[in-house]
């Protein structure tokens, strides 16, 4: 987002044309997260096991959950907040904030969130999965549609 600096918090805003309750349900469910974020993202006892197409796994922890406005998780060594605000017209203004990203990884993580947010919007608004689901065409190989 404009004003973000390498090593500081990563922030992205996105408008998604569904109500906060619907968007929160996607972010907060195993099936929802698997529809746009990871091949699977199963929550057990407030821990989410993310499994990605390239074989990478990450075990995050839910830090805060206040339906339908806030979901915060430990993710990739930092904390990620999804703040959802009704736009007054049936949609949601989402603010994603990722804190704790090292300066060394900042540019890749900053860009990588777009690879999560655009598929989230496509799934929420149109039930379309933008990902290719091909392990030979993953983020590590330069593909944005992993």
List each model region and its residues:
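Beta-strand/loop substructures that line and gate deep hydrophobic ligand-binding cavities in soluble
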Residues: 70-122
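Short, highly charged C-terminal tails/helix-capping segments
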Residues: 122-146
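Hydrophobic ligand-binding cavity/cleft-lining segments
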Residues: 1-40, 146
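Residue-level preference for beta-strand/loop junctions
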Residues: 6-8, 54, 76, 90
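Generic structural detector for well-ordered beta-strands
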Residues: 13-17, 49-51, 61, 83-85
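Glycine-rich portal/gate segments that line the openings of hydrophobic small-molecule binding cavities
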Residues: 28-79
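Well-ordered beta-strand positions in beta-sheet-rich domains
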Residues: 11-13, 57-59, 79-81, 110
């Amino acid at each position: 987002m404009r004003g973000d600096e390498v090593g500081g918090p990563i922030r992205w805003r996105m408008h998604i044309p569904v109500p906060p309750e619907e968007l929160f349900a996607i972010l907060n469910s195993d099936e929802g997260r698997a529809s746009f974020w990871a091949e699977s993202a199963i929550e057990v006892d407030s821990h989410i096991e993310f499994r990605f197409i390239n074989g990478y796994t990450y075990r995050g922890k839910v830090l805060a959950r206040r339906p339908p406005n806030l979901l915060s998780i430990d993710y990739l060594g930092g904390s990620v907040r999804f703040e959802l605000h009704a736009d007054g017209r049936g949609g949601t203004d989402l603010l994603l904030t990722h804190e704790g990203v090292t300066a060394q990884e900042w540019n890749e993580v900053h860009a990588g969130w777009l690879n999560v947010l655009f598929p989230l919007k496509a799934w929420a608004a149109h039930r379309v999965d933008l990902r290719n689901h091909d392990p030979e065409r993953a983020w590590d190989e330069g593909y944005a549609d992993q």
